């Protein structure tokens, strides 16, 4: 039987790898069309440059295809052909030159066909085979004029981790004038897995429009494999269903007695992991049931995730259902309230945690490591792996908390309390993506007292089952205020500031917030910060805010608890600076098992629940590289609470997987 290899995954590539050259002096390409399919992730921010242009006479590249602040795509003149082309040095000039723009917002998490038709006298922009607009321009070139001028231009994307645009591209081609954009649109559309939400059965809707499924009843969802223009695709592939926690994204796991998600096939129930379903004519119906995970799972939100078996981990070859609230139904139970209930403490492992590293067999808590979740979509909620704070907590000698369940009932008077910040706002925050969360927190901190923000943080932690949300919410007011003041000092009312003039102010703020004046940031640190901001020679407020949402949580973490001492240490240098996952992996190539490097992951930006966290990258006993997030209760509490605690480095070296500190190898 054919496998998932029947899907040609090699034709999909990262947007950051896109690069084509065009010979505009070639008679066939005096007018040309750049055509491609693009899939942008939700982590894309606006404004952003999708494709840039450069030729041999340019020292700095200029934008060619951009997304503006209103999420509309704009096609700009070509520097080699058009007098109206944007100035590569003046980053604001592209907003002032003639351009062709889409009429509506550019969609994310969806395949879109883009066609850019360029000639010496006009430009046309096509979306999904339809012309969005046309702009006439003035030609710079004439026949046999300026023979010394370059005739080849490169079009490329910068994309990638830490930049503002991340996504995938397929079937990118430069076509001569004789080929039509519409033909390319129909030629080889990319594939996409989806859930047909309109055909679901056994699912109920509450008053908020949230799906509800009983732990005791089957429900069905149809999964479709189609191309980007909506045609069913007949591929001999199998699809596997799994259950995810909607707040933290790891797979739901129970003991060995029962699987969290069951599937019925030929009248028999199986664990969904053990029973992939084959697609027939591009479609299959999944009959599913969520197990009775525990009484504490009532009202908790889940997603059903579908993925093609043995296929690469592309987001467009995966699909998720709407959030589903798992409820228990019995004659004695009253109808479920629309308001989410508080979650009691559920102490379970996510699918990506390592049990041997998490297990505590003594009265003294060890450091806890949880595997870092790596995903193309930054706004998707990465693994948080924290516990709801609904238990009584006692501290041991290391300042780390042991949990004791409190089974006493909640006082009826307290359960009826109403706070200024509504339950619907709390619910919206729990379900929102990172951009939604950030906007909500800005509004809440502007209109609420400190006590109200603290109560909001506690409620979000209870409803979502993730205490790390509380940490990000509680720092929101300070993060926003510090960032606003920093930009005022940096910009001095200028919209664009040269990067060299920003470095000093950034370092001053970082050293003050991190409470560590003895260690300065290095050139490599600033280069990574510039990469995170997405800027080049000049930085805008949008660039600064992207960088600040990563830097502030890191500085905040360094100022607290056990990390501060490690950051201050110069011999050995436990945390060498701001490094990428790729740099850490490169440095550990060929090292002995147990060698490790500590880093702040650049994919975690505020208000992600793990923003500012530390990740340990190490060589395992299998000589493979592993990435795990440090899991220490109260690691970001004030350092005064750790006067009797062991140094963090001692606790790290006590881990069986870790034995020696590695060093960073720079490629330059």
Swiss-Prot record:
Residues 373-411 are annotated as: Disordered. Keywords: Phosphoprotein, SH2 domain. Phosphorylated on tyrosine residues. Expressed in roots, leaves, stems and flowers. Residues 374-396 have a biased composition (Polar residues). CDD domains: SH2_SHA (cd10338). Residues 574-642 form the SH2 domain. The keyword Phosphoprotein applies. The keyword Cell wall biogenesis/degradation does not apply. GO terms for molecular function: DNA-binding transcription factor activity. GO terms for biological process: signal transduction. PANTHER family: SIGNAL TRANSDUCER AND ACTIVATOR OF TRANSCRIPTION. This is SH2 domain-containing protein B. It comes from Arabidopsis thaliana (Mouse-ear cress).
